[in-house]
């Protein structure tokens, strides 16, 4: 018995798109910096911390292993156009940049995702970010800043 499978392939035009990876918080640099350090320390090993320049980088984070690597990486990044690729491992290195703008602080997160391709190149290949992880982290920072306002008694008054 012969089965014929047909289908179509959709090619993205104009390259990969990503969610925004920066956000301005209505809080001073010192407050935002403290939240950044606490938040990053909760899930990653900090490699570099430079408060003067507002920069924090992480050691590589494991993003999936074995057969699950490709599935997990696809949640956060765009798969490279490597048709025969098989992915045995994934990782991400994050950089956080905080910049004071008067009474506000802008935080920009850069995520570099890579997958280890074990069929053709046998090397680590870049997976362009979708901005998903960065947005989750920016939301966590916003929530932490909001929680600190309520703890300090500066939040909105409820009547």
Residue ranges of model-derived segments:
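Ser/Thr-rich, low-complexity intrinsically disordered terminal regions
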Residues: 9-159
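C-terminal motif of bacterial Sec signal peptides marking the signal peptidase cleavage site
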Residues: 4-7
């Amino acid at each position: 018995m012969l089965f014929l499978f047909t289908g179509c392939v959709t090619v993205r035009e104009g390259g990969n798109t990503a969610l925004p990876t920066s956000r301005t918080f209505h809080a001073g640099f010192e407050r935002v910096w403290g939240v950044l350090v606490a938040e990053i320390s909760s899930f990653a090993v900090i490699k570099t911390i430079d408060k003067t320049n507002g920069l924090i980088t992480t050691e590589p984070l494991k993003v999936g292993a074995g057969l699950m690597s490709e599935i997990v990486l696809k949640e956060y990044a765009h798969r490279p156009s490597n048709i025969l690729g098989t992915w045995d491992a994934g990782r991400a290195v994050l950089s956080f940049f905080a910049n004071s703008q008067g009474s506000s602080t802008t935080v920009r997160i850069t995520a570099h995702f890579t997958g280890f391709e074990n069929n053709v190149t046998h090397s680590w290949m870049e997976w362009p970010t979708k901005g998903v992880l960065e947005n989750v982290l920016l939301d966590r920072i916003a929530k932490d800043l909001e929680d600190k306002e309520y703890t300090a008694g500066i939040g909105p008054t409820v009547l």
